């Protein structure tokens, strides 16, 4: 074997070793049991609900999303969930936030009963075998945790247990994400209005009907964004 071949083999072995280390490190849980980190892309997932419907990460694209891992036997979860319902879900559900509870390894009838007991109205999904949980945290770690995803699917905030200070910080993060998302939507709307304005200038009067529907749709969208903006302003007073 010549020197060039030996050098090539050494590089291949080194790259393989680095790859193994990278994979092992990425699956090593932190002190809270997480195997994902803020800034990571969310693992892909498909969630099944007791009513037979499904949702996936792709379906949530463009939305701010909060995943709440829970179980009926978890006392801390039962303590936290009414706060999620009152302080997060009811405040932001019509302003662009999705909240999904993910119940660890329990059947549909137990989950439905659990939701009624803790009086939450946000949806609870099934997680048989804790397979969804294991995408985000070590399977053997504690269940009570929340994960906030930005509109781009990146992980923005992670919580563990129910600590008021951390919970309040999560609310501020969610609010900020929704404010930023609303600003992006308003900027996009303004750009569309500008395009329509330019189109009208170059359209003969008898063809302007084609832009009227676009104007009507934009007007409705603008009203909806203004409504969300007012609700966000009111919500900010409570942070």
Predicted stretch roles:
Residues 69-86:
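Conserved redox-active cysteine motifs that mediate thiol-disulfide chemistry
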Residues 13-23:
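Sec-dependent N-terminal signal peptides
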Residues 118-121, 127-173:
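Thiol/disulfide oxidoreductase modules built on the thioredoxin-like
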Residues 89-130:
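Conserved segment of the thioredoxin-like fold in thiol-based oxidoreductases
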Residues 28, 38, 42, 177-239:
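Non-globular targeting/processing and membrane-anchoring segments
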Residues 66-67, 99:
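Hydrophobic beta-strand anchors of alpha/beta hydrolase catalytic cores
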Residues 64-65, 144:
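Alpha/beta-hydrolase fold active-site loops
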Residues 27-57:
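N-terminal "domain-start" segment that seeds a small globular fold
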């Amino acid at each position: 074997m010549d020197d060039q071949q030996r050098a090539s083999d050494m590089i291949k072995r080194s790259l393989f070793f680095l790859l193994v280390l990278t994979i092992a490190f990425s699956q090593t849980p932190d002190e809270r049991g997480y195997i994902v980190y803020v800034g990571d892309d969310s693992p892909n997932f498909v969630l099944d609900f007791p009513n037979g419907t499904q949702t996936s990460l792709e379906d949530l694209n463009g939305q701010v999303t909060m995943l709440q891992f829970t179980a009926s036997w978890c006392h801390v979860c039962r303590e936290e969930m009414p706060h999620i319902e009152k302080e997060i879900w009811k405040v932001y559900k019509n302003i662009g936030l999705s909240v999904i509870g993910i119940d660890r390894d329990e059947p549909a009838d137990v989950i439905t009963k659990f939701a009624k007991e803790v009086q939450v109205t946000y949806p609870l999904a099934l997680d048989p075998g804790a397979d969804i949980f294991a995408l985000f945290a070590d399977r053997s770690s504690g269940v009570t945790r929340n994960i906030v995803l930005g509109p781009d699917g990146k992980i923005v905030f992670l919580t563990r247990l129910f600590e008021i200070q951390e919970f309040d910080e999560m609310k501020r993060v969610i609010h900020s994400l929704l404010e930023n998302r609303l600003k992006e939507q308003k900027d996009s709307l303004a750009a569309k209005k500008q395009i329509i304005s330019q189109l009208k200038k170059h359209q003969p009067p008898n063809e302007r009907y084609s832009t009227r529907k676009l104007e009507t749709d934009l007007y409705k969208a603008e009203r909806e964004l203004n409504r969300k903006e007012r609700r966000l302003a009111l919500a900010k007073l409570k942070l």
